[in-house]
Design a protein with these regions (language model features):
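AAA+ P-loop NTPase domains with strong preference for DNA replication initiators
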Residues: 1-112
Length: 112
């Protein structure tokens, strides 16, 4: 029992968000976006607000070793899509658009 006292508790939704970001960096394709839609739906159905998902993804993406220019673009896109998600009705669409944009930024050679 002593071994578990020092381990921090990580909520399941944080683990899901880390998995989503890992997938984004592993493969940039339409098939990945389609696969990740299921993960987003699971988070949303379980009551995780889109704002938490956006901020969780942003924190995980910024941890990755990329250029400062890339990180600034990610922050800009996250704020743009989070704002659209708050003003719109279907959060899933804005989450998908955000990860598609991040995939485009990852492929862009000028930002890496």
């Amino acid at each position: 029992m002593e071994a578990y006292k020092n381990e921090p508790f990580v909520p399941e939704y944080d683990q899901s968000i880390k998995g989503i970001v890992t997938e984004i960096f592993k493969e940039q394709s339409a098939a990945t976006v389609k696969r990740l839609r299921e993960a987003f739906l699971k988070l949303l159905v379980n009551g995780i607000p889109p704002e938490f998902i956006f901020m969780g993804m942003l924190k995980e993406i910024i941890k990755k070793p990329k250029s400062e220019k890339f990180q600034m673009c990610v922050i800009n896109e996250c704020s743009f899509f989070e704002n659209r998600s708050q003003n719109g009705q279907k959060a899933i669409m804005h989450l998908e658009a955000f990860i598609a944009k991040i995939m485009c930024l990852l492929v862009d050679k000028n930002l890496n």
